[in-house]
Amino acid sequence: MGLQLRALLGAFGRWTLRLGPRPSCSPRMAGNAEPPPAGAACPQDRRSCSGRAGGDRVWEDGEHPAKKLKSGGDEERREKPPKRKIVLLMAYSGKGYHGMQRNVGSSQFKTIEDDLVSALVRSGCIPENHGEDMRKMSFQRCARTDKGVSAAGQVVSLKVWLIDDILEKINSHLPSHIRILGLKRVTGGFNSKNRCDARTYCYLLPTFAFAHKDRDVQDETYRLSAETLQQVNRLLACYKGTHNFHNFTSQKGPQDPSACRYILEMYCEEPFVREGLEFAVIRVKGQSFMMHQIRKMVGLVVAIVKGYAPESVLERSWGTEKVDVPKAPGLGLVLERVHFEKYNQRFGNDGLHEPLDWAQEEGKVAAFKEEHIYPTIIGTERDERSMAQWLSTLPIHNFSATALTAGGTGAKVPSPLEGSEGDGDTD
């Protein structure tokens, strides 16, 4: 009988049985140890249960502990509001960052998303484990800007808890050169990258980049003439339409269909003077861009205007042959705006969702560019002279060469001057 009793007590773990009407507090005995005397107090870390006829167990507090834990968890989950799908309008200066996209598990190269995720967690918008696995919050960015590239109109989509004063709380945990400028609710399946119809980038550069090589001037005295500006815009307009840009990126051959991209517009605005140095802004709008593409588009036009390359190189660069296309510095590149025309047509006026046009935020976007992006680009250019250093490499390029691709038409020969950082939003 003693062995059977001990077996029963062991089966019920920490809760002890009361057999019959007499209460008992008999913990499981080891070996031949004597049970505690009658009336001894039960240890405080033990709970007892009472038995009823038929062997039913009745817990003294009236409820099975497992059920209590389960109902408590349900109650806690009910207290948390459901996450909602939103988009955030972001602006940031890319100097000092290794691009936009986060590299989970790597702290060596800091990215914009590292600071963003930290701010989302600290403000209470997402749980901490969502920062470790961004798929849990359905995170997606419109464009994957790379090392040193800034943005005035980046848009990311994600699921968050819509806490009170959400923008103020997120921004309070961000450095001043990263700002969330707007927030809108979107459909549950919205993906900022896939829903984006087009991207607009701008490239800020000193106008002495267009000075002819025979009278090259790289100081504050140079001013862009109307004739040269007209020539620049004529060449930039040649990019409009669909072309094969395999020579404007890396690791893509002429037979790769993804190398064909559609450019809606590209032009250079009137120059302006900052801190005694004249600058101009080149704007380009396209459905999507590959890594290095915009910088190489700018670089080739600069090489033509300066007299290093013939205009015919533009047409050749879209053909199947390998063409040496120079890549302008990344400092002046800025993601200015992303476009959602098709989404706005379908959902923008359905009475449930707002159109993603950000018209009310344009003032804040312009102010951020004037305060953080343009001063950083202009100041860095004056201090480091990245454009002047790059211009000195143009004579090294051989624009008349017509080398065939190695290993057949599907492989691309990498340029010896090609670096690792660039611009790209789809590849």
Curated annotation (Swiss-Prot):
Active site, per annotation: D146
Region described as Disordered: 20-83, 407-427
Expressing tissues: Widely expressed. High levels of expression found in brain and skeletal muscle.
Reaction it catalyzes: a uridine in tRNA = a pseudouridine in tRNA; uridine(38/39/40) in tRNA = pseudouridine(38/39/40) in tRNA; a uridine in mRNA = a pseudouridine in mRNA
Family annotation (Pfam families): PseudoU_synth_1
Entry keyword set: Cytoplasm, Disease variant, Isomerase, Mitochondrion, mRNA processing, mRNA splicing, Nucleus, Phosphoprotein, Primary mitochondrial disease, Transit peptide, tRNA processing
Basic and acidic residues compositional bias, start-end: 44-79
Positions where Phosphoserine occurs in the chain: S415, S420
Mutagenesis or variant effect for Q101R: In MLASA1; uncertain significance
InterPro entries the UniProt entry points to: PsdUridine_synth_cat_dom_sf, PsdUridine_synth_TruA, PsdUridine_synth_TruA_a/b_dom, PsdUridine_synth_TruA_C, PUS1/PUS2-like, TruA/RsuA/RluB/E/F_N
GO cellular component, one term: mitochondrion
Residues modified to Phosphothreonine: T426
Similarity comment: family membership: Belongs to the tRNA pseudouridine synthase TruA family.
Disease: Myopathy with lactic acidosis and sideroblastic anemia 1: A rare oxidative phosphorylation disorder specific to skeletal muscle and bone marrow. Affected individuals manifest progressive muscle weakness, exercise intolerance, lactic acidosis, sideroblastic anemia and delayed growth.
Entry protein name: Pseudouridylate synthase 1 homolog
Species: Homo sapiens (Human)
Name of encoding gene: PUS1
